[in-house]
Amino acid sequence: MNRTSARPAGPRTALMVVADTAAAASSGVDEGADLIDLTGAVPAEVAAFRQAHPGVPVCADADTDAYGGPAGLTRDPAVAAASGARLICARQEEAARSGLPPERLLIETSPAGLVAALAGGYPVLVDLTGTGTGAGPGRTSPDSGTSPGEAAIPGDGPPGAAALAVAALSGWLGAAVVRTLHPQPVRRALDLTDSVRGVRPPARTVRGLA
């Protein structure tokens, strides 16, 4: 028996792309992003993207009303609950203190912490950029192409084989969201994994009669 077949089917892994402008965020959507991380963008860029793509969820620092959301969104879980937002927490203790149900939370982790994070029972966001709160000091970023025995790709080069393998493995193990700087190749890796898991519908169904 192939033990990998025991991976239970579940929801597809969502792709979050980091962007700092509305144009870059829109490009990410075109390349397969399900969510956009605009925490580094100015409010005007966030507003422009939301106007252009009202149905795409946005990750933003929302402690003020500058983003068109309620003030205190991340400081007061009750505000988050009333707004319908999901909170991203760096530690499971924070998630437990929030009082929100698991489906309204995401635990952010680096690839190295994925298995431990999944054991907590909360949906997990895997950060491949190395810049998130779950990355930890001194850890390398798979998105940069850095891994043991592999040199980093300078600048904004595409992710290496190690990064795509980490993305695929994250989806296979059950990560709810994968965050990346490179949407198109990571989307392909996640789609391949979801197809193997049996949770990605075919692009076209063809039926014929003999």
Q: What residue spans do the PLM features occupy?
A:
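Active-site-adjacent loop and "lid" segments of alpha/beta metabolic enzymes
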Residues: 2-31, 43-210
